[in-house]
């Protein structure tokens, strides 16, 4: 395997070719990653991923510690969340996937109506949404937003299911929010807005209101939306003037909520003062909202749900689920987000967490970082699956030929990597119960990350043998394009390799290696030097031990 620049590698390759029975184990010369277009083309042509007749891996939406709420589409995810929160409901609130501003104030109304929120396409009622409505046995629907975001056809589709439909739609998002507030005041069964809490949040961005939404549901608290300048309009102020709430909460700093809004919020609080929850970033604010909810509103850290801050859709329906459980929603970007740090400081109170959305929303690496922060193993993730990659082999260079890799002392690297990969995979599956895919069939080296992703794997461990006159074992991660958690994965697996092989520890290193570049947290193991007779004698005397040690390290990462 190459460990140097092209020029040096070429010189060493020429020199070593003069030594009988020896070869320099090079990586292919070009280690730049493929473009997304090239990867998508390979997927479309069936060059990566499961073959049509290949059995699909068993899917798991949850483990003892993690629940995943992720469907093929945002409508599937929404339906999963709604049906987890409710087995039956008279009402449903239906919002369009293009109308998140209208949905920001929906969770409080869902608390008043004691019902779930469902997401639909704006052009017609999504099949998944219709199916969820049937399962819930709903007879009434409230839709939010005008025909620019939700067509008349959606209303017709709902009515064809036998639902009485009330559409709440104003000329602006603040007008719609006021219609939601007035609707909640005359809700059936004697339920209405409580006086426990009221919140004020930007109507121009969703992050702060989304973090507060479980509280809005649980407390039946109205959320009043400010305009682009952070101000309330006269109708909003008039509706609240003279009311007194136990908590009047302003979400976000002066950029999104003006000083006038803060002052007005204080005037409708029994204490005469608003509670301002505003951090330097949307993630800081999310952590502050969660802490306030736990400390002041009887919420809990258990069952905390992580969701993306890029789009609101994965958490709109989930906010109701969180509100029913009195659990928090936490916005996350990566493992260093303040929300992760906040939850980790309370990990003794956490027996389960949730993820809203798939890997595009909360990446594999971020999930793995969260698991470590909470003191759990990667394998505690729902759906955790390891891609064990045997280096080299058939079509490794995308030329249709079988690539032996390094050759030395009568051994071919590709034979050794395939054997060890199979051993590690068998131990992971049969001893530790960890799902894995063993790639002992080769394939273009630049597509192995994509293959792992297409097979829904969470992490990747690539097995290689070294060459070039040295001795010992080492591991690699990508020098500049490693997925989040790659270093932690390397740091966890490297000692297992060293312990198993028992040769010199050459260290944890970085290198530009295509198989390590991409969305999958990955590390590459250089087991020993194939052209060193002592290294190979040592390895061959303990193949099972090496496999067991590596598998143990992966299982306990």
Residue locations for each model-derived region?
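Bacterial N-terminal signal peptides that target proteins for export
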Residues: 1-8
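Bacterial N-terminal signal peptides
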Residues: 11-19
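Second-shell loop/turn segments in exported
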Residues: 67-69, 94-97, 201, 307, ...
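A short, glycine/acidic-enriched catalytic loop
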Residues: 395-412, 467-495
């Amino acid at each position: 395997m190459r460990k140097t620049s092209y020029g040096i590698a070429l010189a060493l390759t020429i020199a070593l070719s003069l030594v009988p029975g020896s070869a320099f184990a090079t990586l292919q010369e070009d280690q730049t990653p493929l473009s997304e277009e090239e990867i998508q083309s390979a997927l479309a042509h069936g060059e990566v991923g499961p073959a049509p007749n290949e059995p699909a891996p068993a899917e798991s939406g949850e483990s003892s510690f993690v629940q995943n709420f992720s469907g093929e589409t945002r409508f599937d995810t929404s339906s999963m969340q709604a049906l987890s929160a409710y087995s039956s409901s008279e009402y449903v609130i239906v919002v369009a996937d293009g109308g998140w501003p209208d949905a920001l104030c929906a969770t409080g109304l869902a608390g008043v109506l004691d019902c779930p929120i469902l997401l639909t396409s704006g052009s017609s009622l999504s099949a998944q949404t219709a199916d969820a409505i049937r399962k819930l046995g709903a007879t009434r629907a409230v839709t939010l937003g005008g025909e620019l975001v939700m067509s008349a056809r959606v209303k017709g589709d709902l009515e064809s299911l036998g639902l009485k439909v009330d559409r709440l739609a104003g000329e602006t998002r603040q007008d719609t929010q006021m219609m939601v507030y007035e609707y909640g005041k005359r809700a059936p069964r004697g339920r209405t807005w409580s006086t426990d809490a009221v919140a004020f949040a930007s109507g121009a961005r969703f992050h702060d209101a989304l973090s507060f939404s479980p509280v809005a549901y649980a407390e039946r608290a109205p959320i009043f939306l400010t305009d682009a300048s952070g101000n309330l309009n006269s109708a909003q102020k008039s509706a609240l003037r003279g009311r007194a709430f136990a908590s009047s909460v302003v979400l976000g700093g002066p950029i999104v909520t003006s000083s006038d809004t803060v002052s007005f919020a204080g005037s409708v609080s029994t204490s005469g003062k608003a509670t301002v929850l505003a951090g330097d970033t949307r993630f800081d604010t999310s952590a502050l909202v969660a802490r306030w909810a736990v400390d002041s509103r009887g919420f809990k850290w258990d069952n905390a749900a992580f969701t993306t801050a890029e789009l609101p859709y994965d958490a709109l329906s989930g906010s109701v689920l969180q509100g029913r459980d009195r659990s928090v929603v936490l916005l996350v970007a990566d493992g260093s987000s303040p929300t992760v740090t906040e939850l980790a400081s309370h990990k003794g109170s956490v027996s389960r967490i949730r993820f809203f959305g798939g890997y595009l929303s909360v990446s594999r690496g971020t999930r793995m970082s969260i698991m470590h922060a909470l003191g759990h193993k990667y394998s505690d993730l729902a759906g955790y699956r390891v891609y064990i990659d045997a280096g080299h082999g058939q079509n490794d260079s995308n030329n249709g030929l079988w690539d032996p890799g390094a050759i030395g002392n009568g051994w071919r690297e590709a034979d050794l990597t395939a054997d060890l990969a199979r051993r590690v995979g068998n131990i992971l599956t049969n001893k530790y119960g960890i799902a894995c895919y063993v790639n002992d069939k080769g394939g273009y080296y630049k597509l192995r990350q994509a293959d792992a992703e297409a097979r829904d794997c969470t992490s990747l461990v690539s097995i290689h043998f070294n060459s070039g006159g040295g001795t010992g074992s080492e591991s690699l991660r990508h020098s500049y394009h490693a997925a989040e958690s790659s270093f932690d994965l390397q740091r966890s697996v490297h000692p297992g390799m060293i312990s198993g092989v028992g040769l010199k520890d050459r260290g944890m290193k970085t290198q530009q290696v295509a198989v390590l570049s991409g969305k999958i947290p990955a590390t590459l193991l250089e087991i020993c030097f194939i052209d060193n007779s002592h290294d190979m004698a040592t390895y061959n005397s303990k193949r099972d031990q090496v496999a067991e040690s590596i598998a143990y390290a992966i299982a306990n990462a």
